[in-house]
């Protein structure tokens, strides 16, 4: 599985204006003045140590793009300052890339992008996969206070080279905050998969511990979060009880299903934990007394026997009682996996691919009607943070991914 620890990423991505950059970068005084202003306005995209000062080091001209890039030194560590209108490794200018990568949100195949925008399919594949190297948490969330207290988690079942694999997924606030690829769905593999989210979150806030996580009840998922965050409250998804009953009885016992479903959602709407528990008990008693078919009775009895897992949400305001948020995002993931015909390479390549997709999902603009409902904030990431660094969604993503999305010191200082 790919590691997302703070690698020797020493590239700071900054929102320089492409119209004035050439004039600015040639003059160290102008460059430093603009850099000082950026440090004051958005210190989170710079290394923590920069508050103690820095010095101008040197510069070089990119052979690929014929553009000058400057470097600075912060406490004996060298950092490259890359303008946000330039892609990582100087592969291209963002103005030539952003429309094509936006279409990847809708899973337009790489060969089609090459047909319309030029280059070749491998070029576009590598661009998307490279995004997967960035910390998802650190790129998506820019302030420790914005880290969510309440999570939703589940595994997407998919295939790699025809063999079954799983994508442990963590979401909150409408954003995908953690994805990994594992070969199994047992305790050990899922704990490793979900630990990526923990590592990235702790880099942003070392004492971070979420209050709740909503799961589908799978034991390995619950064990993974219990081991990673010992103080977390693990909730079970109420929606899964309804789905289990619906899938087994909607056609064969239609009238009874409608009656039970109505009663079930009335229980869900109970305003207190005590009322919720009472309504569930009465519903189960009715089902037993009237001898409901086992496809309906069994899930209801399971709900009653595990009532604590469903009712604890009343003690945590803002927690997720259902997995609706995750289900909506996983629908997009499901389409992505189907359209790409699942994974074809190594486990590491698969993980980079799905992480790159997650970044695009978090930062690419949404439907204009949705944007209007959020006061002009275009993407889930903007809505979570309440702001953006740049009007171009791709430049906003690149600035957010400064230092690879990590604030910790690089492993290799030179």
PLM feature segments, named:
Residues 1-87, 340:
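Short, conserved DNA-binding cores of transcription-related domains
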